[in-house]
From Swiss-Prot:
Catalytic activity: L-phenylalanine = (E)-cinnamate + NH4(+)
Post-translational modification remark: Contains an active site 4-methylidene-imidazol-5-one (MIO), which is formed autocatalytically by cyclization and dehydration of residues Ala-Ser-Gly.
Function recorded in the entry: This is a key enzyme of plant metabolism catalyzing the first reaction in the biosynthesis from L-phenylalanine of a wide variety of natural products based on the phenylpropane skeleton.
Protein name: Phenylalanine ammonia-lyase
Gene that this sequence comes from: TPA1
Binding site for (E)-cinnamate: 259, 347, 353, 383, 455, 483, 486
Any one GO biological process: L-phenylalanine catabolic process
Pathway(s) the chain acts in: Phenylpropanoid metabolism; trans-cinnamate biosynthesis; trans-cinnamate from L-phenylalanine: step 1/1
Sequence position, cross-link 5-imidazolinone (Ala-Gly): 201-203
Naturally occurring in which organism (per UniProt): Nicotiana tabacum
Active site: 107 (proton donor/acceptor)
């Protein structure tokens, strides 16, 4: 018996057995067992393995993504075909030839194609050759990697998926052709496919015909070599070590190569690998946002989310809860809220407080789409299907790529929703009306009039978000009847996958810009803490020197003002006055004076005595403060800039630290100020590049390495 259940000339006992899960619902449900984070960790592990062994039924999204992008020889992934599949593949190929020789009438073997399948021929080989010729209808423009050429990574993904389908032995193709495609992949030889021209039903006919064109040596076929060089078919075969010359297609083999969903599902696999990473990133960034915004962590309390029942929401909240649990920022914010409960609203705004409720459904959608595509890349999706065991060809429609179109539309909408949340959080972060004491635009210079910080980045974020929201519109409701109304409904799977790839790219732009802004906010909180410490110490010392003693050495009633003066320093936002702390136009000096005035008004009869008058002390207090405070503030800032701050950065005590450390230390980004030359875009570029090449994954997962997969107990 062959691995696909075929018995040459006999019955298929495997498929005749009664299944405990005949409709596959239990299998689909079982695939969602466990946490999304564990699934992402597994995907990352699979992505990094050096070998993908194809057998037809166990290919994963991560493996497709690995073959697609890890194509450099130093870090390449190799493909190996299961020898167990050879017999089944040969059985279906032999069946087609026997059927042809017996005169059996089969679609695409003895008939024409689609709406013209009423035509008949006995010249099966020539029919396959014509199939590839007329499907070579794509337009490239000039070059091999133009705006009209499918990205080579997507082509590699398509080649892998198509091999996996054909290995299952229901397609009537020789094993040697699958070996040749495998050699092309392993040698980094990538056929050039047109970007457009497929409706993914009947499969991705037009782009897949260019892979077949290379295999058959068509003169218009091109490929790209390991170093980006352009190759014709002969050169591609030589570099890949494919011996024996070009393939003369036997009956059904051309149809087997082109009549499937591999291009759409291959690109969808790449898109979903990135989408899952970005979904986890959005959870981590939301937690960091809560930290730098002095957020109230109760929004992650498990009872709230348990009562809502949705698993994506429960997991998102639990992940944020884990990062915030024990956070130094949360502890400091709690003291702040207790000291002055009216300083900020009782509840945080929706972008923070409802982030688990917002992200949860998006994670569920992305996870469901991933499972749908994994089923698709392990499916047999051409037509007709060769059932050797029952000695028949089945004429159906597995080439209809609806799972791709639907899952990609859904995933793209989820990505747009994640981007919308990021933009809402970013907008709060840079706005000093909402960000709980951070400077407007996250400016960090001594002179805010010459530093506009992330203003340009916010405009860019609005642009990204607008384009992302546009891309959220569905593709699948734009179906046109095609091929003389034979293909009157079609999935548009690859088009939707391409649009989702664009959405992923834009969400990476948003995520990288947002992460740079969060790191800026972390450093501003560090600066704030050090400068406020300097202000507090200076006010305390000046108060002791000027308010404690009277002119004759007696204790002065003004000494009782110190505690309230320090409370003013604690409550006043540092960046509201930091550029000129003694300015009478800024709130610090105004409120310090008001404390002394209020005490003087309550000083009663003592105020009439010059020696005990608090009013008489105000001038001396303010004069000395003006002489000392600006120098102390500058000294504290200089100490921080030289790496010797009085108070260390709180982020080092937080579970979110690995991501901050990566951005600052490994990528070499820095606090952005108007005093320096470096622009926000330069720093965002570094993070974006790290996201695109996968460097960001490990520090992101390190933030969650101690999470046990469950919320904190309710007690």
């Amino acid at each position: 018996m062959a691995s696909n259940g075929h018995v040459n000339g006999g019955e298929n006992f495997e498929l005749c057995k009664k299944s405990a899960d005949p409709l596959n619902w239990e299998m689909a449900a079982e695939s969602l067992r466990g946490s999304h984070l564990d699934e992402v960790k597994k995907m990352v592990s699979e992505f990094r393995k050096p070998m993908v062994k194809l057998g037809g039924e166990s290919l994963t999204v991560a493996q497709v993504a690995a073959i697609a992008v890890r194509d450099k020889s130093a870090n390449g992934v190799k493909v190996e075909l299961s020898e167990e599949a050879r017999a089944g593949v040969k059985a279906s190929s032999d069946w087609v030839m026997d059927s042809m020789n017996k005169g059996t009438d089969s679609y695409g073997v003895t008939t024409g194609f689609g709406a013209t399948s009423h035509r008949r021929t006995k010249n099966g080989g020539a029919l396959q050759k014509e199939l590839i010729r007329f499907l070579n209808a794509g337009v490239f423009g000039n070059g091999t990697e133009t705006s009209h050429t499918l990205p080579h990574s997507a082509t590699r993904a398509a080649m892998l998926v198509r091999i996996n389908t054909l290995l299952q032995g229901y397609s009537g193709i020789r094993f040697e052709i699958l070996e040749a495609i495998t050699k092309l992949i392993n040698s980094n030889i990538t056929p050039c496919l047109p970007l457009r021209g497929t409706i993914t039903a009947s499969g991705d006919l037009v782009p897949l015909s260019y892979i077949a064109g290379l295999l058959t040596g068509r003169p218009n076929s091109k490929a790209v070599g390991p170093n980006g060089e352009t190759l014709n078919a002969e050169e591609a075969f030589r570099v890949a070590g494919v011996n024996g010359g070009f393939f003369e297609l036997q009956p059904k083999e051309g149809l087997a190569l082109v009549n499937g969903t591999a291009v759409g599902s291959g690109m969808a696999s790449m898109v979903l690998f990135d989408s899952n990473i970005l979904a986890v990133m959005s959870e981590v960034l939301s937690a960091i946002f809560a930290e730098v915004m002095n957020g109230k962590p109760e929004f992650t309390d498990h009872l709230t989310h348990k009562l809502k029942h949705h698993p994506g929401q429960i997991e998102a909240a639990a992940i944020m809860e884990h990062i915030l649990d024990g956070s130094s920022y949360v502890k400091a914010a709690q003291k702040l809220h207790e000291m002055d409960p009216l300083q900020k609203p009782k509840q945080d705004r929706y972008a923070l407080r409802t982030s688990p409720q917002w992200l949860g459904p998006q994670i569920e959608v992305i996870r469901a789409a991933t499972k749908m595509i994994e089923r698709e890349i392990n499916s047999v999706n051409d037509n007709p299907l060769i059932d050797v065991s029952r000695n028949k060809a089945l004429h159906g429609g597995n080439f209809q790529g609806t799972p791709i179109g639907v899952s990609m539309d859904n995933a793209r909408l989820a990505l747009a929703s994640i981007g919308k949340l990021m933009f809402a959080q970013f907008s709060e972060l840079v706005n000093d009306y909402y960000n709980n004491g951070l400077p407007s635009n996250l400016t960090a210079s001594r002179n805010p009039s010459l530093d506009y910080g992330f203003k340009g980045a916010e405009i860019a974020m609005a642009s990204y978000c607008s384009e992302l929201q546009f891309l959220a519109n569905p593709v699948t409701n734009h179906v046109q009847s095609a091929e003389q109304h034979n293909q009157d409904v079609n999935s548009l799977g690859l088009i939707s996958a391409r649009k989702t790839a664009e959405a992923v790219d834009i969400l990476k732009l948003m995520s990288s810009t947002y992460l740079v802004a969060l790191c800026q906010a972390i450093d501003l909180r560090h600066l704030e803490e050090n400068l406020k410490n300097a202000v507090k110490n200076t006010v305390s010392q000046v108060a002791k020197r000027t308010l404690t003693m009277g002119a004759n050495g007696e204790l002065h009633p003004a000494r009782f003002c110190e505690k309230e003066l320090l409370r003013i320093v604690d409550r006043e936002y540092l960046f509201a006055y930091a550029d000129d702390p003694c300015s009478c136009n800024y709130p610090l000096m105004q409120k310090l004076r008001q404390v002394l005035v209020d005490h003087a008004m309550n000083n009663g009869e003592s105020e009439k005595n010059v020696n005990s008058s608090i009013f008489q002390k105000i001038g001396a207090f303010e004069d000395e403060l003006k002489a000392v405070l600006p120098k102390e503030v500058e000294s504290a800032r200089a100490a921080l800039e030289s790496g010797n701050p009085a108070i260390p950065n709180r982020i080092t005590e937080c579970r979110s630290y690995p991501l901050y450390r990566f951005v600052r230390k490994e990528l070499g980004t820095e606090l952005l100020t108007g005093e320096k030359v470096r622009s926000p875009g330069e720093e965002c570029d570094k993070v974006f590049t790290a996201m695109c090449n996968g460097q960001i994954i490990d520090p992101m997962l390190e933030c969650l390495k101690s999470w046990n997969g469950a919320p904190l107990p309710i007690c």
